[in-house]
Each structure stands twice: as C-alpha cells, then as structure tokens.
C-alpha cells in the first residue's frame, strides 16, 4: 500500500530496483509514486489499473506482499465481481504470508487462494487443505513429476515459481504443472 492507502502493484517494498526513484512504497503517496518511471516510460500501476488493463482477458494472480493490504484487495475484487461483471475465478490471491491467506478465506471464501512456499511442501499442502486453497505455488526446485501428480490428485493446481531459464521451463513442463510463474513468458 502507498502512504495514502492505495493498492500498488510492485514486486519489492522499495521502488529502488524497478524504477528511476528511491524510497519505500509505503512511505510515498500515490501522487508521489506516479512521478517515477519503470524502464523510463511506464508509471507504477495501481491494482485497479491492472484490473482495467486486463479487462477480463486473463487470470490475475495477486500476490499479497503485506497483511495490511488484504482487506483492500478483497474489497477491490468484490467490487469488480459485483459492479463490473467479473467472476471470482478470474482472480487468484497468493502469498507467503499465510495469515493474510487465512484472512482472505475468512472474509470471502469465494476468492481462489494460492499458497506460496519456498521450503516445506508438506506443510504448505496441509495449510492449503485447511483453508481450502485452489492451488499451491512452490519454488520449482521442490517439485518432481511424482509429487506434482500427487498434489493434483488432492485437487490442487500447481503453479511453480520463478522459472526463468529455458532448460528449467522445459523440464517443469514435463511435470504437467497447471501453469508457470516466470519473468519471461515468451520463453514458455
């Protein structure tokens, strides 16, 4: 969230690496953030702007970076469902912050949830079952063809991250995952 409470779409907690500016996202207002540029031309988008740009043409995976943004993200999704004709299954809320995911499940159990994990696949699976998640998002090194099939047999989709090297992408595709999280979609 920006300093004035807007939902900002950016990977890091600062703008230092991805823009021509410096500072923490939560210390800058939306107006201040809009001054800075990504790759010299694009402004930092709000989540609403991303929804409008996507215009229902794709699944939107929203990774919650902070628990503080949870309720606002839920409210924005609900607005697009009730006022703009979107469907809940056009969204997927994921996070490493399992408290945030539990809050999503508690506040609106229609919103699909993806459980992110970097280390413990079994614990993530147990948590996913507990909150009735739709998918599991493990670091790709945790996956084998066998455990991918086992996860899917339990009714969960598998979206591994972040797979950027062509060789790794080709290998993971042989596991029959449901999707791949990458910085380079053109390599898929």
Set out the residue ranges of the language-model regions.
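Conserved residues at the C-terminal ends of beta-strands
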Residues: 1, 36, 65, 139, ...
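Short, glycine/acidic-enriched loop or turn micro-motifs at the edges of active sites
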Residues: 1-3, 15, 66, 165, ...
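Metal-dependent phosphodiesterase/phospholipase catalytic core, i.e.
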Residues: 6, 11-118, 131-134, 154
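C-terminal active-site rim and adjoining tail of enzyme catalytic domains
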Residues: 39-44, 114-188
């Amino acid at each position: 969230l920006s300093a004035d409470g807007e939902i900002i779409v950016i990977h890091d907690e600062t703008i230092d690496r991805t823009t021509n500016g410096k500072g923490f996202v939560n210390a800058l207002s939306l107006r201040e953030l809009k001054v800075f540029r990504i790759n010299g031309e694009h402004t930092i988008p709000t989540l609403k702007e991303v929804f409008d740009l996507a215009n229902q043409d794709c699944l939107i995976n929203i990774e919650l970076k902070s628990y503080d943004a949870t309720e606002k993200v839920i409210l924005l999704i609900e607005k697009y469902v009730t006022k703009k004709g979107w469907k809940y299954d056009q969204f997927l809320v994921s996070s490493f912050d399992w408290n945030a995911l539990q809050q999503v499940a508690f506040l609106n159990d229609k919103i699909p949830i993806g459980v992110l994990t970097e280390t413990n696949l079994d614990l993530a699976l147990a948590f996913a079952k507990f909150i009735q998640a739709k998918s599991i998002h493990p670091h790709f090194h945790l996956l084998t063809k066998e455990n991918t099939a086992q996860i899917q047999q339990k009714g969960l989709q598998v979206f591994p991250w972040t797979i950027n090297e062509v060789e790794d992408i080709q290998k993971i595709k042989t596991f029959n995952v449901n999707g791949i999280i990458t910085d380079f979609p053109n390599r898929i």
